[in-house]
């Protein structure tokens, strides 16, 4: 039977069809918009991530960009350089070396913007920093009659490796230089550099006070002190500031890489850096990292605790530096201030560290460019304020220091009391436990004088960088300690420990007296370094069966050797004297 549609039925069917069609179209449109919206969201998110990365890269940018590297240029990438010079040029070079103790003739021909190869550890290079949260810094560079090219290379090195967002300023402090080029010429040059300020002292202040003058003008959160002949490597600044940002009581040093004074080769330490120590003359020394410090650190890029610092290059929170009492302004010129500050940091609740990811090259001159006549005065101040009863070991090895007028130290002692600083005994046991503490028993330390050749004393003078590379000899007694200071220990060792812990030995089948490294505390004493200092004044060596004897060479020069013992031979009689 056929179905007949009424008008009303047809209308309902059409309405239903349109409704379904509308819903279908809406679903399509919604799906399209959702898909397009997600695409736009992904695009926007990607753009924001890209912007964030771009912003991070922007924040790491230095104030100035180095010119492109020229691999053919002298000294580029830190390579050694040597010039082929005629007679006149060679004479000029030697004159400049004599004046500056650095090969300035070569330095003047090396780019002020040279590139240094970045050999830092992978973990250092891959570190990420939140630049917006890092403290800012003022870099303080004090100088006196510094050569033009080494000073400017230092300045450009800072400007070209320090993120602009972190570098508040470079403050140059001219400590009354008298070189013409450091007057108007320098002012004109730095007037074209952003964030570089020049301050001149009106009298010779010395390194300590010159740096303090710079610190008073600093506006950064952190004070970063550099010497005036340095080159900063890539990424040198961020690790220092990040560490201080996490712990304001940390005083942090970069790894100090060596720049050869003659060839300007940049020797970058790629292994574990050395840490600072001292000998009992209060002279700074480098030491390897002890096992307990290696065990304490979790990562090889963690900061390394150091008993002392070299002093030329370090960063410290400005607030904390002021809290600690800044530098001891009673110290003159330079020398000893680094140990004084090191003791103070540790004994007064701070910590001193070397950051393995921060590298700064330093030109170590052929010799000190100018004298430090106040070294004993400065070290005596440090000993009197911070070393308690242990200062006697310093004075025993530096007899002239007992007569030094080290000035008024009452304020420094009040500072120690106010900060509730710990004892030097605590420092030795907790910070530098590997340092051997001398016995210095009464009557058994000092110069050992020959009774047979009474003007002569035992003397040990080793070559540089080879402590055991010489033999015991005789030299005119001078009463200055140093090379003529020895200690006879309860272990029957004859120790030479003004510089490093060396023990007198007689090599097998030999008649001379050499030196070897002493055994560490608690370890057995080898037979060939045991001596008997007898009541009659003879010094007997049981292992060889011989006695120490003074004698004169055929040329008449006094010397010492091992000989058959003879109680009647005055040349075998010795005595300790201060």
Swiss-Prot record:
- The segment annotated Catalytic subdomain A runs over 134-243
Kindly list every residue the record annotates as glycosylated. Answer: 471
| Membrane topology category | Single-pass type II membrane protein
Cofactors: Mn(2+)
Task: State the residue spans of region: Catalytic subdomain B.
Answer: 303-365
Q: Which residues bind substrate?
A: 175, 204, 334, 370
Put simply, this protein is called Polypeptide N-acetylgalactosaminyltransferase 4
Q: What species is given as this protein's source?
A: Homo sapiens
Q: Which gene encodes it?
A: GALNT4
């Amino acid at each position: 039977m056929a179905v007949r549609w009424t008008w009303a039925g047809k209308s309902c069917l059409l309405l239903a069809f349109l409704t379904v069609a509308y819903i279908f179209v809406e679903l399509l449109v919604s799906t399209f918009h959702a898909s397009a919206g997600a695409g736009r969201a992904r695009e926007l998110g990607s753009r924001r991530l890209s912007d964030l990365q771009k912003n991070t890269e922007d924040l790491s940018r230095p104030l100035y960009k180095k010119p492109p590297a020229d691999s053919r240029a002298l000294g580029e990438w830190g390579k050694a350089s040597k010039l082929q010079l005629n007679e006149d040029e060679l004479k000029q070079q030697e004159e400049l070396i004599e004046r500056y103790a650095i090969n300035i003739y070569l330095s003047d021909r090396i780019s002020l913007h040279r590139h240094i190869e970045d050999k830092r550890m992978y973990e250092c290079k891959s570190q990420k920093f939140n630049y917006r949260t890092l403290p800012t810094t003022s870099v303080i560079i004090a100088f006196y009659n510094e050569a033009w090219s080494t000073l400017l290379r230092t300045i450009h090195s800072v400007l070209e490796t320090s993120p602009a967002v972190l570098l508040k300023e470079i403050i140059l402090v001219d400590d009354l230089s008298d070189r013409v080029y450091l007057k108007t010429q320098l002012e004109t040059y730095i007037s074209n550099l952003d964030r570089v300020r020049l301050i001149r002292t009106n009298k010779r202040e010395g390194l300590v006070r010159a740096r303090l003058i710079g610190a008073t003008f600093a506006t950064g959160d952190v004070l970063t002190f550099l010497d005036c002949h340095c080159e900063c490597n890539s990424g040198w600044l961020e690790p220092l500031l990040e560490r201080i940002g996490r712990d304001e009581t940390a005083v942090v040093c970069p790894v100090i890489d060596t720049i050869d004074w003659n060839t300007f080769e940049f020797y970058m330490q790629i292994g574990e850096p050395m840490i600072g120590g001292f000998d009992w003359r209060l002279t700074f020394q480098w030491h390897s990292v002890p096992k307990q410090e290696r065990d304490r650190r979790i990562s090889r890029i963690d900061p390394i605790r150091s008993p002392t610092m070299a002093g030329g290059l370090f960063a410290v929170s400005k607030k904390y530096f002021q809290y600690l009492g800044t530098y001891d302004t009673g110290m003159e010129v330079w020398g000893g201030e680094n140990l004084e500050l090191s003791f103070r940091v540790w004994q007064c609740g701070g910590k001193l560290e070397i950051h393995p990811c921060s590298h700064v090259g330093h030109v170590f001159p052929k010799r000190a460019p100018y004298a430090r006549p106040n070294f004993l005065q400065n070290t005596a101040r440090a000993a009197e304020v911070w070393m308690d009863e242990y200062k006697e070991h310093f004075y025993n090895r530096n007899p002239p220091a007992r007569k030094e007028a080290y000035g008024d130290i009452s304020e420094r002692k009040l500072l120690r009391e106010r900060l509730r600083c710990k004892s030097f005994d605590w420092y030795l046991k907790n910070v530098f436990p590997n340092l051997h503490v001398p016995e210095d028993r009464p009557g058994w330390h000092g110069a050992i004088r020959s009774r047979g050749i009474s003007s002569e004393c035992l003397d040990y003078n080793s070559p540089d960088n080879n402590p055991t590379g010489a033999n015991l000899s005789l030299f005119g007694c001078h009463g200055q300690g140093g090379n003529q200071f020895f200690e006879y220990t309860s272990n029957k060792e004859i120790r030479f420990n003004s510089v490093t812990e060396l023990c007198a030995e007689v090599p097998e089948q030999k008649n001379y007296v050499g030196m070897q490294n002493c055994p560490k505390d608690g370890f057995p004493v080898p037979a060939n370094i045991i001596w008997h200092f007898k009541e009659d004044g003879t010094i007997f060596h049981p292992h060889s069966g011989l006695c120490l004897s003074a004698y004169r060479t055929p040329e008449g020069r006094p010397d010492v050797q091992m000989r058959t013992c003879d109680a009647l031979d005055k040349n075998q009689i010795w005595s300790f004297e201060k």
